[in-house]
A protein has these predicted regions:
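Cationic, low-complexity basic patches in intrinsically disordered or flexible, solvent-exposed regions
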Residues: 4, 10
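Short, structured loop/turn "capping" segments at alpha-beta junctions
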Residues: 92, 156-160
Length: 212
């Protein structure tokens, strides 16, 4: 987990002992705290079930003891997600490019706000912070973000679950496209093995191994 990243720099016997002891204690409790990076739209959309589902997702992140990483905006579905996660006690990290800050899009009350110079740096930082990735319904920006995650998974540059929240069939077309890529020999099941589709929050819990 991210709490033990210091071991990459200077592992020693004491540090390894602490790590192993901590992992054992966490396993006894059956829970690993995750930074869950969520990609989603800054608009509401015209399906009222989106807001209800995103608030449910935010509440679960907080109530389960996990932390949220998202794009930092107060607008639309992004704002609803952050507000519900904060209300449920989650640590919430927003990652926003500086030109959004100047336009006052940032959410108030975040645990941490990270400002990046541009969109590419924002994508990099959100991946760097995440232990798991969820793509909620969103627009082309959301598609760009989750596509980079899938690409890095295929190249084995990261190793983490990537869940596309197929709410009301929103990502059915993308699911079919990914399958078609395999059929046409342009991708493989191995390259897509970390990519999953969830129909509801229960599916997400099961995929992330956090069903309680």
């Amino acid at each position: 987990m991210r709490e033990f990243s210091f071991l990459r720099k200077s592992p020693d016997c004491v540090s390894v002992f602490i790590l192993l002891y901590s992992i054992e204690e966490i396993r006894k409790g059956g829970f690993f705290r995750m930074n869950i990076t969520v990609y989603l739209g800054a608009n509401e959309g015209n399906d009222t079930s989106f807001r209800q589902a995103v608030e449910e997702l935010g509440r679960w992140i907080g109530e389960s003891g996990n932390a949220l990483v998202y794009g930092g905006s107060k607008s639309g579905l992004m704002g609803a997600l952050a507000a519900s996660a904060l209300a449920a006690g989650a640590e919430v990290t927003g990652v926003e490019p500086e030109f959004f800050i100047s336009e006052s899009f940032q959410m108030e009350g975040l645990t941490e706000l990270i400002v990046t110079k541009d969109i590419p740096e924002r994508r990099t930082k959100m991946i760097e912070l995440g232990d798991a990735f969820i793509a909620f319904p969103g627009g082309t920006g959301t598609l760009e973000e989750v596509s980079e995650v899938m690409s890095k998974l295929a190249l084995k540059q990261i190793d983490a679950p990537c869940v596309l929240y197929n709410l009301n069939g929103y990502y059915a077309g993308l699911k079919a496209l990914l399958r078609h890529m395999v059929e046409m020999g342009l991708s493989t099941e191995e390259k897509q093995e970390k990519v999953s589709f969830a129909e509801n929050l229960g599916d997400i819990k099961a995929i992330l191994g956090a069903e309680k």
